[in-house]
């Protein structure tokens, strides 16, 4: 039930259902991609934190986890050993070197959180921290910001 573009390499990785991988993406060993993840064209997963040509570090591959429904934009780079949260959204060209919260909108080099995204892919109109609620105009889902964490109310 997955879709893979041209020039896609898959190592010993675990890939869920309904994942869409665009052209020119390499998915190395120890990467876990949960269901409904989107990997944009030419996005990059790294597998060794401190590579050197003269040193074999194949036994040092770090685990990277991409949670359910996340979007990884075109040409973004994920440094190995991190977790990308459920329904988070990584902007095109971002360099991500730390864990990402669920529903977070991440952009820049190095990447930082600039907002929140809904499951529909709509920007959630709440600040990065505080106590607020927002209703998605497309789905009617309610999102609640509690401190620095956003939750979808079911």
Can you name each region flagged by the protein language model?
Residues 1-84:
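Flexible, glycine/small-residue-enriched loop-and-beta-strand segment within the central core
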Residues 86-89, 95, 143:
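Internal alpha/beta core interface subdomains
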Residues 98, 107:
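HATPase_c (GHKL) ATP-binding subdomain of two-component histidine kinases
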Residues 85-88, 101-103:
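Conserved catalytic segment of ABC-fold P-loop ATPases
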